[in-house]
């Protein structure tokens, strides 16, 4: 894993550590998540790109794109603070990631990108659709799968 990816992962962890137990559950993370777990996060060669939005050098939002076999997996999060929530930071960082995806789609093997959102996380579902992802599947009435291609 490159130094750049390690630094970005630490910035993602900084954001994720601000999440409540419920928000961690929305992302499929354990309640007691405290940082990078090499067995949980994608290996370095599976990371395609990480986009981070900053406020005065403080990481406040991320959009993470990893390889997941026949598709790419997308993850997004915003620092848990009224100062940053519902201010458009997530949409902005997702759009940066989608711009990169469209520009590099051929090099990525023309794989579609999936965004998984818990069915009880309407904010994530709404953001996925607002950013151009289309709902394609629902698994066990727990996860909605959104596709971008």
Describe these PLM feature segments.
Residues 1-22, 148-149:
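Conserved N-terminal entry element of GNAT/NAT acetyltransferase domains
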Residues 21-24, 28-73:
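Acetyl-CoA-dependent GNAT
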Residues 86-103, 126, 130:
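Conserved acetyl-CoA-binding loop-helix of GNAT-fold acetyltransferases
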Residues 98, 111, 133:
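Polar, enzyme-active/binding microenvironments
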Residues 116, 134-148:
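Conserved catalytic-core motifs of GNAT/GCN5-like acyltransferases
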Residues 118-137:
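Conserved active-site alpha-helix within GNAT-family acetyltransferase domains
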């Amino acid at each position: 894993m490159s130094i750049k990816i390690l630094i970005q992962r630490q910035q993602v962890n900084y954001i994720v550590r601000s999440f409540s137990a419920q928000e961690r559950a929305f992302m499929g993370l354990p309640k007691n998540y405290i940082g990078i777990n090499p067995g949980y996060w994608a290996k370095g060669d599976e990371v395609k790109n990480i986009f981070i939005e900053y406020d005065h050098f403080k990481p406040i939002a991320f959009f993470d794109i990893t390889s997941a076999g026949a598709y790419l997996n997308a993850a997004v999060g915003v620092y848990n603070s009224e100062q940053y929530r519902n201010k458009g930071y997530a949409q902005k960082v997702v759009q940066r990631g989608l711009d990169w995806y469209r520009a590099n789609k051929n090099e990525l093997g023309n794989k579609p990108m999936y965004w998984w959102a818990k069915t009880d996380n309407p904010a994530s579902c709404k953001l996925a659709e607002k950013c151009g992802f289309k709902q394609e599947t629902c698994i066990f009435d727990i996860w909605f799968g959104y596709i971008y291609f």
